[in-house]
């Protein structure tokens, strides 16, 4: 079966820059909505094909739906942990340390429904799993308002 291509012409893709990390490579995002009362955030992430983004830990509950491509999750050592095809939905609690990326054939687009609070959504880690940066609700809200 031919890969499905999501028409993203109307999506405003953004890069993510986090001090002291700089621009997060192989990642684009678009914040679709932020419910400021309940702290529910809807984001599209695009991960580059055959690449891995920086090591991180989700600090809040995430529901994901793969819109295009294959969503790959990797162990901290780079070993493939899971491959989620187009159309797969997954609900994951906080705490898992991993990298993410796109499959072999195309960039992956994943819808994230993030159920959080007004604190940290993601911890960015070095290869020894030390926290080197974070992405908070306030950061995501700021990105949403700046789009």
Predicted regions mapped to residue ranges:
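Short acidic-glycine-tyrosine-enriched beta hairpin
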Residues: 36, 74-102
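Conserved short histidine dyad/triad with adjacent acidic residue
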Residues: 31-33, 38-57, 93-95
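A short, N-terminal "cap"/entry segment at the start of jelly-roll beta-barrel domains
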Residues: 1-39, 126-147
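Ligand-binding loop in jelly-roll beta-barrel domains
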Residues: 85, 94-121
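Glycine- and acidic-residue-biased ligand/ion/polar-headgroup-sensing regions
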Residues: 49, 58-77
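Conserved catalytic motifs of the protein kinase core domain
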Residues: 40, 62, 107
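Histidine-/acidic-rich catalytic cores in large beta-rich domains
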Residues: 9-14, 42, 65, 91
